[in-house]
């Protein structure tokens, strides 16, 4: 990763186009996935807490092992925070109450997490993704993406404004905060834009590109670590 005081243009490009932009999306999707696990258990008459524990425990162990070769990786934190904020919701039988808790908890924790950045955005975004699925929004927006399209009228200028603020504050004490919130707004814009594009002739193209990536996301994430380590050894990079 280019240093802040060297490769300046590359550093700025990565900060504006990649860093903090997609991690929130992945976290949000994990939240949706955990809601699907609970929903599947509920439909089959199985214990939702048990279903969550069976998924989260292996993820926690895998994340802990992955930390040994990739310090700072996300899986351990996904599992730990999911145990902390999502697992208790499996015991909330009133689904209206469950959705409400996840929604407001997600909003508050994401706002707070944006202030601290890094792994601290995980709890709120897991809850927001969970609430998103519990409200049935993935199916609703797939049928009619109009709300997502309309939200772009707010999200696009917001993302641009916060990105501009991020660039203006680069090198100052405020940069960390503007960069975090710019990343969150950018991620929200990408989600809304994707839903909009999925109702266009690009749907088949996007589906062909993203569906395999979604199915292999965990495999690719783990494999990338070993590819990077192998490449570094081959090139003699410490």
What positions do the PLM features span?
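Alpha-helical transmembrane segments and their immediate juxtamembrane cytosolic regions
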Residues: 1-238
């Amino acid at each position: 990763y280019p240093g802040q005081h060297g490769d300046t243009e590359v550093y700025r490009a990565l900060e504006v186009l990649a860093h903090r932009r997609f991690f929130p999306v992945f976290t949000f999707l994990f939240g949706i996935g955990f809601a699907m696990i609970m929903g599947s258990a509920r439909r089959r008459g199985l214990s939702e807490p048990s279903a969550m524990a069976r998924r989260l425990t292996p993820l926690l162990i895998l994340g802990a092992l992955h930390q040994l070769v990739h310090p700072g990786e996300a899986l351990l934190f996904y599992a730990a925070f999911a145990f902390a904020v999502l697992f208790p919701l499996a015991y909330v039988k009133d689904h209206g109450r469950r959705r409400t808790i996840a929604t407001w908890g997600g909003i508050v924790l994401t706002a707070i997490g944006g202030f601290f950045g890094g792994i601290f955005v995980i709890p709120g975004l897991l809850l927001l993704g969970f609430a998103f699925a519990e409200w049935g929004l993935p199916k609703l927006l797939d049928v009619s993406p109009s709300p997502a399209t309309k939200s772009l009228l707010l999200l696009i200028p917001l993302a641009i404004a916060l990105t501009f603020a991020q660039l203006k504050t680069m090198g100052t004490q405020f940069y960390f905060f503007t960069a975090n919130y710019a990343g969150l707004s950018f991620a929200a814009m990408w989600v809304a834009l994707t839903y909009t594009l999925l109702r266009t002739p690009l749907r088949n193209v996007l589906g062909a590109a993203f569906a395999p990536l979604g199915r292999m996301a965990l495999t690719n994430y783990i494999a990338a670590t070993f590819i990077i380590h192998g490449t570094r050894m081959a090139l003699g990079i410490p």
